[in-house]
Amino acid sequence: MSYNGGYQRDQRDSYRNGGGGGYSNGYSNGNSNGYSGGGSGGGYGGGYGGGGYGGGYGGRGGGAGGGDRMSNLGAGLKKQEWDLDSLPKFEKSFYKEHPDVANRSQRDVDEFRKKFEMSVQGKNIPRPVETFDEAGFPQYVLSEVKAQGFERPTAIQSQGWPMALSGRDVVGIAETGSGKTLSYCLPAIVHINAQPLLAPGDGPIVLVLAPTRELAVQIQAEITKFGKSSRIRNTCVYGGVPKGPQIRDLSRGVEVCIATPGRLIDMLEAGRTNLRRVTYLVLDEADRMLDMGFEPQIRKIISQIRPDRQTCMWSATWPKEVRQLASDFLNDYIQVNIGSMDLSANHRITQIVEVVSDFEKRDKMIKHLEKIMENRGNKCLIFTGTKRIADEITRFLRQDGWPALSIHGDKQQQERDWVLNEFKTGKSPIMVATDVASRGIDVRDITHVLNYDYPNNSEDYVHRIGRTGRAGAKGTAITFFTTDNSKQARDLVTILTEAKQQIDPRLAEMVRYSGGGGGGRGGYGRWGGRGGGRGRGGNYTASNAAPLGGNRRW
């Protein structure tokens, strides 16, 4: 089945020219075996032996996004002057309304949107679809979707697919874990298969920008899975790892590039790729990218892409900075919002907020873990305010017999990937993280989130606890709140009230007497490493190499 007479790729990776085009020569892409998923971001085969640990790594700079935040990035990129009349034409409108969708009354459509707390803005917005068949995807896409066992589209997919397939610029606002990745991935696959083949030296057709390497790798996994039948090649471009494999992928040619902004600009400045062929641009977690200071890099990257592209922007929130970005780079966009536009937490999450002093935190954390880990299937993600505290808490837990590991921006990429895999598989069901991971981690079955330190703002609180209660499941979020956090009390109570959660009387008192006193931080014990981790070798920082204490707690 071909789409609007475009270029079709069947199971044998053959291509048939359906006319149009404008790009020279139908480059065959050379690789009869297709592409297994883009090299960079894969797992590991070997174990990590060796005796002891070498005391951790020196500071690597970086923070969120692994060193992507460099203010002079992009200075070497030339400003592009676009003459749309001379650019090759491309297809971007593929949506044909299914008869069942067309025959629904407006009342039925309104009730469907109301049921899923869905609001839309813009002109000539297509109606939502209720089944995968109604979306009108080609068979090669539908077969992959059905093979995954999905029963029906999520709310954001129901409305997002018709919008994206129509070729319009799209803004989607939905909570993390709502299925938004597939909302843009499947239309991207259709878009690619309607374009002329890549010629030698061409850059990607689809570019996905993401704030963190963890999220980028997760997006790559989805693209790989659903692009498999049509041999779509991809690569993941992010900092903190050697550039060689990424350069190799780009030079061979990939239809999809998933990237963090800093490393992509590195590649562009070095001439390792170009964005001349990009006709489908995705900004995923746009709010997070702006929070992390990537706006200048995003603007430089977009300046290298033809202005008549299709742009899809996805975000969990809709602050004024994101609205401005949409206004600057999207044309006549249509928008879908799932849930309230006010900052709110997932109602499937039970939120427990305890007002504590700093010196009480460790004992209270242990008591909660004892209860949580009574069920061996549970997983707990613990958030701390700093990398230092993350490492201290991890050592403390491991020495107390708990199978905890930590992840943050100063860990080498190899170690971060290993920790994530240990957590996902349940081998280490407790993971300690900083905010660098608060939106980048996609582990579907996290049952508990524990905020050891309260975040700097309410948006980060909502995103942190959103790691649990995903894909329709229920979850529990436990938060330690101190007098040092009192300025955040009013916003937190608003979120708790909206979600109909119980409120600690001491928290309510902080709101009444807002701004209450300081109360210095209780001193943290210096849980220095004890040397000689078991079989972990010098590949791991001291906190993750600390041996489990003799009193195994799990």
Swiss-Prot record:
Biased composition (Low complexity): 25-34
Domain Helicase ATP-binding: from-to ranges: 161-336
EC class of the enzyme, as a word: hydrolase
Pfam families per the UniProt record, alphabetical: DEAD, Helicase_C
Gene3D superfamilies per record: P-loop containing nucleotide triphosphate hydrolases (3.40.50.300)
Domain Helicase C-terminal span(s) in chain numbering: 364-511
Motif, Q motif: chain positions: 130-158
Signal peptide feature range: none
Keyword DNA-binding set for record: no
Catalysed reactions listed for this entry: ATP + H2O = ADP + phosphate + H(+)
GO biological process: nuclear-transcribed mRNA catabolic process, nonsense-mediated decay; rRNA processing
Any one GO molecular-function label of the UniProt entry: RNA helicase activity
Motif stretch (DEAD box): 284-287
Region called RNA-binding RGG-box, residue ranges: 513-536
Record EC number: 3.6.4.13
Binding-site positions, ATP: 174-181
Locations listed in the record: Cytoplasm; Nucleus
Region (Disordered): 1-41, 521-554
Keywords: ATP-binding, Cytoplasm, Helicase, Hydrolase, Nonsense-mediated mRNA decay, Nucleotide-binding, Nucleus, Ribosome biogenesis, RNA-binding, rRNA processing
Subunit structure: Associates with polysomes.
Similarity field: Belongs to the DEAD box helicase family. DDX5/DBP2 subfamily.
Description of its domains: The Q motif is unique to and characteristic of the DEAD box family of RNA helicases and controls ATP binding and hydrolysis.
PANTHER family: ATP-DEPENDENT RNA HELICASE DBP3
Protein name as it appears in the record: ATP-dependent RNA helicase dbp2
UniProt source species: Aspergillus oryzae (strain ATCC 42149 / RIB 40) (Yellow koji mold)
Record gene name: dbp2
